[in-house]
Amino acid sequence: MKVSELFMPTMKETPSDAEIESHKLMLRSGFMRQLSSGIYVYLPLGYRVLRKIENIVREEMDRAGAQEVHMSALMPKELWEESGRWAVFGPEMFKIKDRNEREYCLGPTHEEAFTYIVRNEVTSYRDLPKILYQIQTKFRDERRPRFGVMRCREFTMKDAYSFDMNEEGLDISYKKMYDAYVRIFKRCGLDVKIVEADTGAMGGSNSHEFMVPSSVGEAEIAYCKACGYAANLEKAECLDEPVENTEEIKQMQEVYTPNVRTIEELVNFLNIDAKRFVKTMIYRADDKFVAVLVRGDREVNETKLKNLLKANELELANAEDVERITGAKVGFAGPVGLSIEIYADNEVKYLKNFVVGSNKTDYHIKNVNLSDFKVTKFADLRNITQDDLCPKCLSQKVTIERGIEVGHIFKLGTKYTEAFNCVYTDEKGEKKLMIMGCYGIGINRTAAAIIEQMHDEDGIIWPITVAPYEVIVVPVNIKDEQQSKIAFEIYEDLQKKGVEVLIDDRDERAGVKFKDADLIGIPFRVTIGRKIADGRIEVRNRRTKESVEVDIESAVEFILNLINEEKARYKV
């Protein structure tokens, strides 16, 4: 492809609304343009990258025995009512009506459609197991689209669904997908951490996320360098460590704390360590209110709380509800005398003579103990921190860092097959529910995550497996007849050898061409300049920044060897 003919509108300046490197570079390199908030158009270079990622995904899905289908992005309300998710999925679902007032949604995910099809077409144990997948556009009405394609309203996903006769079969399908994901991300050049995850709105019993460590990631992950344990912050377990407390029980004492609401303010005002406080947080869980207790230096893990309560919706109570329930303004809630259910983190079990809110504005109570109020249930309800030991090996404190989720796999069990009565007839003629798994990869997110992990001050450093082109040939002066002739000869020879190659035939300064080549991240740049008088050209590796001069006669063979060596880095 000639660069003079390529639709590649690169930008010198970084758009002011682009916050992270992948967003900046995808715009600057001419890979995409924004059509509206959270909606992007992919231009030729960007679309080539997406197609290459899709092809890697497709090859590994096929290798794992999955079969590709294509579902409709538009789905009728009735499907989602059958699963029970029409009302509970939330405002992220795009809902529309046709001219006859029939309701539909633009699919944020496709469990319903796949289960419906399999229910109607698979009836016997002889037809199982099955793993079906698609690479399809998804839609989610994000409240605040941001970070380019990391959180957008329209995106491409590979979603696969397995259907098995029993849990043992699901384990096999799950392992196949797990292994396929490891291969996919290796081939894409990504360094991923595989972490235990919460199943969230998808439901099910077990889940893993494939996370790319990045300071701009929206999720936090905790992992142990000693044993390899890894989980996202929502899922990471906190040890219930019994602590012997020999303090004598003291008499409760109300203290005046005018306008002192936060733990930090209380620590300074009362000169008491944060670990001696118990925070009381009031939550609305669906249609009821509950109180949650955690130690003063801890934070409530809302995912753990939501799972414990089996709630569809969970949010902090507003100031008006807090005052109605506690009789006090926000910042002074406490467990003593509360009429709603109280759930407490396990750590609270081992505290004595702690400080809580008084349920009276501007007052707290010292020397409160568990006998002074009733706890409905103790559970692990806090976020793990870097001061906590690994819950598996107990030998080292965990490390916490941010990450970008590029893949997520779930053991769904019978959540959807039960809702849809998706059954098969076993060898004894009995009807049994199929067991499901669900497996997703964000194609656009994967591209952005690669950029976040592989870029420098000059631009993108694409792994050769997903780069839009493998080589760019750059004649320094296109008007120089000899340079132009040799450049086109090398370009055409590489094309004949099956290499994906660009030639920058623009009448531009060499510096402009070099900057664009680095910006768009082509793995190898072949420069044809004045040294052709000595029969030599330059080949530069974008990843290593190493440049080598080679004889013109052996240049094509040399470049082919470099390409093969680079591809070998990503083989599985």
Curated annotation (Swiss-Prot):
Annotated InterPro entries: aa-tRNA-synt_IIb, aa-tRNA-synth_II, aa-tRNA-synth_II/BPL/LPL, Anticodon-bd, Anticodon-bd_dom_sf, Pro-tRNA-ligase_IIa, Pro-tRNA-synth_IIa_bac-type, Pro-tRNA-Synthase_IIa_type1
One Pfam family recorded for the sequence: HGTP_anticodon
Compartments in which it is found: Cytoplasm
Gene Ontology CC: cytosol
Enzyme superclass (EC): ligase
One GO molecular-function entry: aminoacyl-tRNA deacylase activity
Catalytic reaction(s) noted: tRNA(Pro) + L-proline + ATP = L-prolyl-tRNA(Pro) + AMP + diphosphate
Keywords attached to this entry: Aminoacyl-tRNA synthetase, ATP-binding, Cytoplasm, Ligase, Nucleotide-binding, Protein biosynthesis
UniProt cross-references to PROSITE patterns, sorted A to Z: AA_TRNA_LIGASE_II (PS50862)
Predominant subcellular localization, coarse grouping: cytoplasm
Domain of life the protein comes from: Bacteria
Subunit structure: Homodimer.
Family to which the UniProt record says this protein belongs: Belongs to the class-II aminoacyl-tRNA synthetase family. ProS type 1 subfamily.
Name under which the protein is recorded: Proline--tRNA ligase
Organism of provenance: Caldicellulosiruptor saccharolyticus (strain ATCC 43494 / DSM 8903 / Tp8T 6331)
Lineage: Bacteria, Bacillati, Bacillota, Bacillota incertae sedis, Caldicellulosiruptorales
